[in-house]
Amino acid sequence: MEKAKLTKNLKLKIKNAQLTKAAGLDKLKQKLAQAGSSDTKNSSEKPSAKVAEKVVKKKSVVDPSVSATPESVSSETSPRRIRAKNRSSFVSEDLEVSSPVPVDSDTTSSMPPVEEEIASSTDSEPEVIEVTQPPIEEKSEVVTKVPPTPLKEPEVVVKKDPPKSVVGIKSNFGPTGKHINHLLAKTFKAPKKEDKPAPKERSGQAQAKPQQSSEASSENKPHSPNNNRSSQPFYRRDTSKKPGSDFRDRAKKDDNPKAFTGRDRYGLNDGSDDDKWRKKRVQKTKKHYDEHTIQRPTHIKVPLPITIKDLAAEMKLKASELIQKMFIHGMTYVVNDVLDNETTVQFIGLEFGCTIDIDSSEQDKLCIESNTVKEEIQETDPSKLIIRPPIVAFMGHVDHGKTTLIDSLRKSNIAAVEAGAITQHMGAFCCSTPVGNITILDTPGHEAFSAMRARGAEVCDIVVLVVAGDEGIKEQTLEAVKHARAANITIVVAINKCDKPNFNAETIYRQLSEINLLPEAWGGTTVTVNTSAKTGEGLPELLEMLALQAEVLELKANPSARARGIVIESELHKGLGAVATILVQNGTLHLGEALVFNDCYGKVKTMHDEHNRLMKVASPSVPALITGLSSMPKAGDPFVVVKNEKIAKDIIGARLAGQQKFALQKKRPNFDAMLQNKKILKLIIKADVQGSIEALASSILKIVSDKVSAEILSNSVGEISESDIRLAAASKAVIIGFHTGIESHAESLIKSLGVKVQLFNIIYHAVDAVKEMMTALLDPIAEEKNLGSAEIKETFKSSQLGTIYGCLVSEGVMTRNQKVRVVRNNDVLWKGTLSSLKRIKEDVKEVKKGLECGILLEGYQNAQVGDILQCYEVIYHPQKL
């Protein structure tokens, strides 16, 4: 065995020696050893030869004027190329191999990429590698141009010493072009610490650079990729700058890597960007407040109206504390509710030990007149006052002849054109009589126009109480007396219809005395006059009495003062817009003057009298129809003249701003109606004038019932428009039109949306119609009326019909298709319909008492012998309000 092993090893050694000799490795080893010895000699004798050669090479590239031999030019100007296929890694760069090892092109093309730029074997022209580092100023260096001497091939000396490891090997490829990194001995050197130069200014000229030793420059500052290959350690990468690379283009390395944040999660941060410029967000910290006792005020001043929230803020309390205290006292409010009662606000303040005063400064600013018309006249200089015509209001019960009596005085025929022969609007007229001018107010007598009568009593100076001699004092007559007494106005009684045969003045005197109006004929102070509107009897005496009362009252006014008065009626005209009938109480109203009402303003454009004649001025106690208003004022609103329209607009704007502050407060639902499950009739009212709306709405709201109630969604003046119809369709409401019509283009919409619209000219007809609609909402009351009863004697089973009951009629009549109750031991087991009734196999409509019959119940099969079948019918009765 040992012999065989020795023989095998000997054969391997001989074979390896033959291979080495064939490849020429022994000669290469000798050349390498000889080259190493020559390098050491050259370096010791001329250490700066390589540096000079590098400078000369650089000069030859930059300065073409330098003369050189063709050999030197070819060797210096053309850059040296690294060819892995014809150089051995064991040979130094300065030596040239005479016989390069041939390598196939396939092997070179499949070589992996390296960090150095390696030219392909097919390149024919040399490549010039530009130096990207800032050039060194040549002026500061004194370099002698030495012509390069051609390198002589040293003699090959074979040494037996083993080859030393080469430190400066640039290429990592062997003679076959494959990696030999694992065969090379790796030696590491600590990098030298060098002071980094300061960044240079970017300019076109090269900056001066301090001179360095040739050794330092050759070791640390390589000027070309070829010259620094042997000086750099093999473990360092090529640090030569590529074109376009500069320290400004390089991203700074973050020593403290940034933590992953939410912005990274959503891709908002770019990892390559430097985010150090971002300002760090300051973390919010809880503020610690010093706890101290809140000193609540003991005396405050608040305006009215005010919300619960604002009142609590003024009192330094929580709104919940106020609401809790008010709930204890039986008042339910929420935080946004408005308090407009002075007593309620002051009571809340006393509960918390705070005195509350009402601040009226804002209201005083918006209030133009600080006193009433009567107070203003009393404060005026008597020399400026003149006697004005009396304002007389005719009041009384409906159909007692008020309007007819006025027609007789004015020689007019107003009553003939009134719908239903009753007055439903308030009229103002100027009447010239033998005793002087009189302003007459005609008020409605129907119970629905109570507000109109109240306004008439407040405006007028004398009330003429018209009483029909054949009917006597009625309900509205008593109401008119109450209004007159409340306004402290003189009453003159006109006993009308004295031409009728059943006229009895003594009965009227007795009724007047019962209400503390003792007539003069009975020794009292109440003036009474017997009149007849048809014959004109007693009219002169009535006028004389009115003139006498006006003289006693000493009615005066100041015509030079600014005009003040009251709105009698207002309406919406198609061509003129908002118009109003006003009555001047003091001063004189001229065309073009600006007026301020409660919630609107205007500039008088036109004025007309009751005969539609133009007027330029309106003196005291004179009514007029004016136009040019911003909106429609309410009946009974006072007005006053201001300097110009701008002031009037500003005043109304301030008033409306205060009203709109609380306009958005929602109406609280009627919890009583919700608990009682009351039904609601929703209405939309349209009328010709503001007074008619007021009268109709008040009459409807007076309809009181525990089962149903009326709710007015909207009320306005004018014709029924498309917006009203759409509102009614959306809210399922009924539109009530009073003395008005429907717009032409809105009639088709009524049919398409199916809205119910009812038009009326007489107010009590409208009120009666509303009552009927409210009654129709109520479910009718069902009443069960017994018709007869029968006892079950036998039961029969049928596969087709079910159970058939043989019965004997004990009471009344059993009728087919009527309701039936099955009663057992006085307990009702079932209610249903009697579907079939037979008498001796014949269908009959009814079976009377004492007869037998067969009965089939619809949907019930569980009746037994002895049960009672009671036949009854259901009668529905409408409910009453």
Swiss-Prot record:
Family to which this protein belongs: Belongs to the TRAFAC class translation factor GTPase superfamily. Classic translation factor GTPase family. IF-2 subfamily.
What ranges does the record list as Basic residues composition bias?
278-287
Q: Which InterPro entries match?
A: EF-G-like_DII, EFTu-like_2, IF2_II, IF2_N, P-loop_NTPase, Small_GTP-bd, T_Tr_GTP-bd_dom, TF_IF2_bacterial-like
The gene name on file is infB
Q: Where is this region: G2?
A: 421-425
Q: Which ranges are annotated Polar residues under compositional bias? A: 68-77, 204-233
Per UniProt, residues of the tr-type G domain are 387-556
Can you name the source organism?
Chlamydia felis (strain Fe/C-56) (Chlamydophila felis)
Summarizing the function annotation, the protein's role is: One of the essential components for the initiation of protein synthesis. Protects formylmethionyl-tRNA from spontaneous hydrolysis and promotes its binding to the 30S ribosomal subunits. Also involved in the hydrolysis of GTP during the formation of the 70S ribosomal complex.
Q: Which Pfam families match?
A: EF-G_D2 (PF22042), GTP_EFTU (PF00009), GTP_EFTU_D2 (PF03144), IF-2 (PF11987), IF2_N (PF04760)
* Recorded coiled-coil stretches: none
Q: Which Gene3D superfamilies match?
A: P-loop containing nucleotide triphosphate hydrolases, Translation factors, Translation initiation factor IF- 2, domain 3
The record, for HAMAP family, names: IF_2_B
Q: What is this protein called?
A: Translation initiation factor IF-2
Where does the UniProt entry say this protein principally localizes?
cytoplasm
GO terms, molecular function: GTP binding; GTPase activity; translation initiation factor activity
Keyword set, alphabetical order: Cytoplasm, GTP-binding, Initiation factor, Nucleotide-binding, Protein biosynthesis
- Residue segments, region G5: 532-534
Which Gene Ontology terms of cellular component type are present? cytosol
Specify where the region named G4 lies, as residue ranges.
496-499
